[in-house]
Amino acid sequence: MAATTTILSSAAPTPLTAPPRARARAPAARRRRLRARDILGAALGLANGGASAALAAPLSYEETLRLSTDSGGGGGGGGEFALPDLGLGGVLDFVAQNPLVAAAGVAAVALPLVLAQVLGGASKPYGVVSAAAAYRALVEEPGAQLVDIRPPGDARQSGAPDLREAKKKAAAVPYDGEDKNGFLKKLSLRFKDPENTTLVILDKFDGNSELVAELVTANGYKAAFAVKDGAEGRRGWLSSSLPWTAPKKGFSLSDLIGDGTDGLPVTLGLAAATGLGILAYTEIETVLQFLGSAAIVQLVASKLIYAEDRKRTLKQIDDFFNKKVAPKELVDEIKEISQALLPSTGTKSQPAITEAAPATAEAAPAAATATAAPPAAPVEETSTEAAPAEPTPLSPYTNYPDLKPPSSPSPLAPAEATKNESESESAATESAPAVNSAPVAEAAPEAAPPAAPRPLSPYPNYPDLKPPSSPSPSAP
């Protein structure tokens, strides 16, 4: 009858109640015959042992032997295998004798770690790839796009990747760590479908490429990968001998506009203004004709819509064509010349005024007797538009009948001279008409009686035609 033993797992094991029974060592051939269940059990045992090593208390050598004895007695058949000794030689002998068991144990321990690394790395949509892998992805994947985050100066000096094989073009969007929102906005303008776009981030070196890859994937892009060592690194794009476009030495419109959209409106506005200026300079006549036509259309539209404006506009057009544009007839031209050179027809012609006599008291009657010649009939003013104005004659003879002026009067007797003096005084009290005054056109005056002949010599005004003698100075 087998003795019953009690195993206690503790740091200080208790003494055994019965000494262990010596067990014969199984032959080597028997130990090598392993079953599938024994291998699986050993692998699971190693895995569980490794997982719960921190929780289980250490067992002594005697306890390990008792456990192996119990498992061997309970199996009751061949196929069991003996655990190696805890020494280094025993472990090596066990691995050499049981390679499948050792491999299964290592696989059971390493497989969870490998799966965790693989699955954990695949779950992240961003990472770092080599330049060759990045170029291969750009060529093979339709949704892969290259984003060049280098500063504009570096891109102009060094060049850019050549993606003609992939029928794509690198999007130059410089990255500024202080303006992440602006960077994302520029990317959104370049790529309209971020959920299906995989970005390959290229920097000058490793600088900010991985940070940008994480940033863009966190903002809705499918995936992003940073090129290891960037464009100019030791294992970067240039060092991998991938297609590269050398910088352009001449003027390039794409460099002026840039790949971004910030400078596009200003540049296109300047180009449009320059083109319009050149066109206006070369086609100034056509431009003026166009502007004149536009002004005429505006005038017609604003002046002929309403009835009142239409009447007023038509009158202005008629006056313009009749007075300023239409050719004048010869009579109208002569009329304008006569109006400019000759005095107005409304003024009355007056006969020539004789020189006044010496300023003396007796000279007044002589001045009073000087009467005007019969005035010509006043001519009513007529409209200059109705009939052409008659030219004013420069000769005074036209004012007399048959162009004959009155003859010079003969000297009168003293009695008649006194009578004429009284008549001249009475006539002087009346208001004499102003010289060269305009005639009144209300009504034609009655025909005045013919005036007495006016003597041309002052001597008839003195008795016996003798003027008074000058006073002689008195004696002192």
Swiss-Prot record:
The chain crosses the membrane at residues 100-120, 264-284, 287-307. The keyword Chaperone does not apply. It is found in: Plastid, Chloroplast thylakoid membrane. SUPFAM superfamilies: Rhodanese/Cell cycle control phosphatase. The keyword Transit peptide applies. Coiled coil: none annotated. CDD domains: RHOD. PROSITE patterns: RHODANESE_3. It is a multi-pass membrane protein. One of its GO terms (cellular component) is chloroplast thylakoid membrane protein complex. Residues 1-21, 22-58 form a transit peptide. Keywords: Chloroplast, Membrane, Plastid, Thylakoid, Transit peptide, Transmembrane, Transmembrane helix. Residues 403-412, 447-476 have a biased composition (Pro residues). Residues 140-246 form the Rhodanese domain. Residues 11-21, 351-389, 425-446 have a biased composition (Low complexity). InterPro entries: Rhodanese-like_dom, Rhodanese-like_dom_sf, STR4-like. Residues 1-29, 342-476 are annotated as: Disordered. Rhodanese domain-containing protein required for anchoring ferredoxin--NADP reductase to the thylakoid membranes and sustaining efficient linear electron flow (LEF). Component of high molecular weight thylakoid LFNRs-containing protein complexes containing LIR1, LFNR1, LFNR2, TIC62 and TROL proteins. This is Protein THYLAKOID RHODANESE-LIKE, chloroplastic. It comes from Oryza sativa subsp. indica. The gene is TROL.
